C-alpha cells in the first residue's frame, strides 16, 4: 500500500515537470545552431568576467546629518613656510569669542625658502594633482578609497645641503581650538596677551624685512589622514610688496570617513582666496600678513565605502546567463525564418507539405468527380 502511494506521488510530481526532456533521437543539430551556441557562451563568459570586476569594485555613499558635537576640540594641522626669519613672525589663533589660543604646539624651524630640485618636482606633482581634482570632482572618491596607500603628502626632506642662508621660517605642528569660527594668522612680531584680545610686537621689526611670500605644504582640520589631499596643499604665493595681505576664507565641514581600511573623524573644507596691498592713503586698511578665517558648518557628512552583496552578484549572473540564452534562441529562430523566406521555401499558395500533397493525390485517384458521376 505504501509503495502504491509512493508511486502515485512520484507520478503526480512527474506530471508537474515544467522542463520536459526531449529524447536525443528527436534532436537535430545544425551548424548555425552550433555557431549561435558558441557566440552565446562567449558572450556569457565575457559578461560574467566584467561583472566580477563590478562586484569587486566599491563606491562611496554620502549621507548628511546635523553635527551635534559642540564640546569637543577642533584640531588644526599646519605646515607653512614664510619667507621671513623666525624671530620676526608670530602665529596664533583668535576665535569668535576673542579667546587667544596658545600656540605651544607649533614649531618654528629656520629653513631655505627655495626648494631643492627633488622638492620642486614633488611640489609640481602635487599642483598637477590639485588641478585635476578641481576639474574632476569625482576623483575625490578615488582618494577616499585609496587612503593609507598613496604617496606621502608631506614635503620630502632636502637632499642637499643649502649653501644660501636660512632666510625663511617653517611653522608646523597642530593646535586645538574650540568648534567656533576663528582666525588663524601669521603676522609680524610675536604675539602677546592683551586685556582686549592680543597684540603683536611689530614695532621691533624693520618694515624693509616684511615679506609674506609663503608656501602651504599642508593645512587640514581634524584627524590627519595620510594620502588625503586638501584644497590648500601645495599653494605658493609670492609677495610683490612689503605690505601684502593674504586672506583665506575657509568653510569647514565635519566628516566621518569609513572605508574598509580606515575609520576616522576628519574635516573637509572649501576655501576662497583674496590678496591685496595695504595702503592707508588709498583707503586699503589692514595689517600685513597671512590670515585664515575659518567657519564650521552645522552639517556633518558621513562618507561610507559600500560593496555589492554576494547574493546580488549571483542574481546578476543568473540574469546574464538566462537573458543571453533567451535572446540568442529568439534571434536564431528569427534569422532561420528570414532565411527560409529569402530562399523562397515559403511561397503563398504554392508551398505545401509533402504529406499533404500525397494525401491529395490519393483523394483525387480514389474519389470520382461529380461530373463523371453525373454522366454515368
Swiss-Prot record:
Keyword Zinc in record: no
GO annotation (BP), single: retrograde vesicle-mediated transport, Golgi to endoplasmic reticulum
Q: Topology: which residues are Cytoplasmic? A: 1-33, 340-376
Which compartments is it annotated to reside in?
Endoplasmic reticulum-Golgi intermediate compartment membrane; Golgi apparatus, cis-Golgi network membrane; Endoplasmic reticulum membrane
State the gene name recorded for this protein: ergic2
Query: What keywords were assigned to this record?
Result: Endoplasmic reticulum, ER-Golgi transport, Golgi apparatus, Membrane, Transmembrane, Transmembrane helix, Transport
Choose one Gene Ontology CC annotation of this protein and give it.
endoplasmic reticulum-Golgi intermediate compartment membrane
Organism of origin is Danio rerio (Zebrafish)
Q: How does this protein sit in the membrane?
A: Multi-pass membrane protein
What protein am I looking at?
Endoplasmic reticulum-Golgi intermediate compartment protein 2
- Cited InterPro entries: Erv (IPR045888), Erv_C (IPR012936), Erv_N (IPR039542)
Chief subcellular location = endoplasmic reticulum
One matching Pfam family is COPIIcoated_ERV
Q: Which residues lie on this side of the membrane: Lumenal?
A: 55-318
Record function comment: Possible role in transport between endoplasmic reticulum and Golgi.
Transmembrane feature ranges? 34-54, 319-339
